[in-house]
Amino acid sequence: MSGKITDFFEKKTTTTIDEAENKDNDKELTSTTTTTTTTSTTSKKKVAAAPKKKAAVASKKRKHESSDEETDKEEQQNDDDDDGEEKVENNNNNKKLKNEEKSEEINSTITDNNYYDDIENYFTDKQWKEALSGEFGKAYFKKMITQLNKRYSSKEKPIYPPKNEIFSAFNYAHLEDVKVVIIGQDPYHGKGQAHGLSFSVKKGVSPPPSLINIYKELETDIEGFKRPLKNGFLEPWARQGVFLLNAVLTVEEATPNSHKDFGWADFTDAVLKILSKQDQPIVFILWGGFAQKKEKLFTNKNHLVLKSGHPSPLSIKHFIGCKHFSKSNEFLKSKGIEEIDWKITE
């Protein structure tokens, strides 16, 4: 921009000077023509005056050039100032963007950490919380909780059980008081069913098919057991030391096994290893091929492992008649441990 302004001033100045010189020359010619009768002395004065006029014009031209140079310098300085201000503004904007990005990253971390703290606080039993503290700090667990946080927050598809009931199985009995472990695959995926205990449903929810078959087996296995028609809430078992653990602790609505790759298997395998190391005798009940793959985790000979088909209607013939409930009580009694009252009332 400064170059264009300078060219304009130079052209304008040159034109003005040329016009001045032409006017002076015209005056001289006119003067010479009209004063033919004037004395030679007067002509000499006019000739002597001409160099003075030219000198004045030249001086005027130099002033214009000097003014143009100063204008160029001022414009260049202004351009430099503008560039400097623009650089400062860009630097400030970059710093602002970096600070905003860092703030977002920190906020994201805080959100994840707060959720992680909440999850840990869902363990109300101190023994379990202490026993699993090493798992809480592992990368797979943090990644899993972060992923679950996004799924629960998005609300695109309901996740079961509710977040505060994921670890319900750990809060009914101390680690040292566990007597029987019944392993399920993943939670019920219907609305209002799952609440953190394998095979159990919430109060007021009718028993699902697998639980109905469990009740049928109890009717033939445990004397005096009467099958409840409308109650599938197995909390009374959990309070006596029956650890109802699903291998995968969360699921999307209407999508069984949808969270099987989240990392839950690593966590629940760690739980089963902890149980296997316990000195008190425990009965591990494995229904179906999925649960029976966990048998390799139980290396302590103090424990009893019972296996059969799954109580699902698809494999009922391999389940009915297993008598796992009476066998569990017989084992506990032989070890001097109080038996389980399997009764569930309406």
Curated annotation (Swiss-Prot):
Q: Name one GO molecular function term.
A: uracil DNA N-glycosylase activity
Q: Where is the composition biased (Low complexity)?
A: 30-42
Q: Report which superkingdom the organism of origin falls in.
A: Eukaryota
Q: Does the keyword Transport apply?
A: no
Start and end residues of each stretch annotated as Disordered: 1-105
Which family does this protein fall into? Belongs to the uracil-DNA glycosylase (UDG) superfamily. UNG family.
Return the protein name.
Uracil-DNA glycosylase
Q: Which gene encodes it?
A: uglA
